[in-house]
Each structure stands twice: as structure tokens, then as C-alpha cells.
Amino acid sequence: MADFRTELSELMHEIMNQNKKIIQCGDYSNLLSLCEQDITILVMLKKHENLTAKELSDHLRAPKTTIVTAISRLVKRGYIRRVQNAKDRREMYLLLTEKGVKLNKEHDEFETLFLNSLVSRWNIEDQKEMADLLARRKEIR
């Protein structure tokens, strides 16, 4: 087990180093001003339009109060907006603003550079094996 933990630790440090290198190479100041949870919410809203706070908290497996606080922060910063459901006026949908869409593009660019720099050194078989391991991890949750 020690070898596995050592390898995993080395991978974690490699990931952190790649992250730093890419941040130093580009202007990711908008992205860096947000916490991981905020970015995750923006990515989720890109994938699923018209989510409510409850649906978002279910997707992210996070308490609704935590998500509502993050939503308020993102609304205040202009990344998302609330839109009232025409059929049920008590329900509010969450939508990305133009600023939110732009930040998601910045995140996609960063993530692509990051993943390419990390995975490019692995051969195809290793990439497939890692994908299989990650897929199994999802099944365990």
C-alpha cells in the first residue's frame, strides 16, 4: 500500500505543479477570484440549463443553504441571474449571464491546457486504464 500512496502523492504534487505553471502562463485572474465551489456551480449551470437551487444542491450533493450562499455570491458578482418560473412563481431558475459564459470559456481553456499537459506524457493504454479507474470510482460513490 505504501507504493500506491507514494505514487498517488507524486501524482497529486505533479497536478499541483502543472496547475501553478499554467496559471503563471495566462491571465486567469477572474478564475482565480472564485472558489472551487463557485466554479463547479458555473460549470453545472453550463451543462444543465434552468436548474433551481434545490436541483443544484442535489446534483452537487451539498446542503441547499451552502448552495444558496454561493448562488447569492455569484449573482452579486454578475456571473448568474435568477429567473422566475412562469408556471410556478415561487420557483427561481438559475441562468448564466454573459459574464458567466465568458468565465466558463476561460475555465474550459484552463482545464484543457492543464489536462493536456498532464496526460500528454501517458501512452494511450495508460490513459484508458486511468479512465477505467476513474469510472469505477464513480460507481463506488
Task: Specify the residue positions occupied by each region the protein language model found.
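Alpha-helical linker/hinge and terminal dimerization helices associated
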Residues: 15-22, 26, 60, 103, ...
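C-terminal regulatory/oligomerization modules of transcriptional regulators
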Residues: 1-4, 125-141
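Charged, amphipathic alpha-helical coiled-coil/dimerization segments
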Residues: 72-128
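N-terminal helix-turn-helix DNA-binding core of bacterial DNA-binding proteins
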Residues: 24-63
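Residues within helix-turn-helix
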Residues: 53-54, 65, 72, 92
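N-terminal leader segment of winged-helix/HTH proteins
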Residues: 1-32
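Short, locally clustered residues in the helix-turn-helix/winged-helix DNA-binding domain
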Residues: 43-47, 108, 135
